[in-house]
UniProtKB/Swiss-Prot annotation:
Its main location: endoplasmic reticulum. SUPFAM superfamilies: Acyl-CoA binding protein. Keywords: Endoplasmic reticulum, Golgi apparatus, Lipid-binding, Transport. GO terms for biological process: fatty acid metabolic process. An acyl-CoA binds at K15, Y30, G31, L32, Y33, K34, K52, K56, Y75. May play important functions in the control of brain and pituitary activities. May regulate GABA neurotransmission through a paracrine and/or autocrine mechanism. May not bind acyl-CoA esters. Pfam families: ACBP. It comes from Pelophylax ridibundus. Transmembrane segments: none annotated. GO terms for cellular component: endoplasmic reticulum; Golgi apparatus. GO terms for molecular function: fatty-acyl-CoA binding. Brain. Is selectively expressed in glial cells. This is Acyl-CoA-binding protein homolog. It is found in: Endoplasmic reticulum; Golgi apparatus.
Length: 88
């Protein structure tokens, strides 16, 4: 499979996990997903009262500078780790 196909499959599989991952695991996946699909963060940091938006922004911002290909590979690895941990 191509890296893009692996990524697309992993993104679909993560939605089917039997148990919801922890918030930290979800933030890690979110940051890698956005870096894979959009690239470096391109939006303003949300206000401090938007806790969920700020957490997502921080997760994505931590991946800044990572190439889309490396982010895809890291996302697939993390997804496989979560599938092993939580099952489909």
């Amino acid at each position: 499979m191509s890296p893009q196909a692996d990524f697309d499959k992993a993104a679909g599989d993560v939605k089917k996990l039997k148990t919801k991952p922890t918030d930290d695991e979800l933030k890690e996946l979110y940051g890698l997903y956005k870096q894979s699909t959009v690239g470096d963060i391109n939006i303003e940091c949300p206000g401090m009262l938007d806790l969920k938006g700020k957490a997502k922004w921080d997760a994505w911002n931590l991946k800044k500078g990572l190439s889309k290909e490396d982010a895809m590979s890291a996302y697939v690895s993390k997804a496989h780790e979560l599938i092993e941990k939580y099952g489909l």
